């Protein structure tokens, strides 16, 4: 199974493929703006980092955070995680609108750029990372199970997230 995960991609923000000696066959696809890359970029921008370039900082900040039920509940009110994810409620009108939506949702803007000492920002990064992992692992597990395989190849900008890769590797084992 090959899963491409991107902000926009050439045509799809997420696509799932089955591969064999004859080539690749598309199993599922999700068009932008329903994009995990846009979701992660929106939170990246909200926390004061450059979207489509500063996502590694968000991933690093997540390591300093903890689960926060309040943050998770609010984020899940605009983001549906899982195999049939839908993030258009947050990012459907673009990153600047998504940042405004996050400011309204949380009633605050964190320090710019966010630092590990900002517990709230670190917790938001942690919850964001967890939702991304939950969604991608669900996609991988669902399509690997359907194809009867345990091997997966991730591609695209979202797949550069090393913490995500660790979770996918552990789930596929």
Spans of features found by a protein language model:
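Short acidic/glycine-rich loops and adjacent helix/strand connectors
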Residues: 1-173
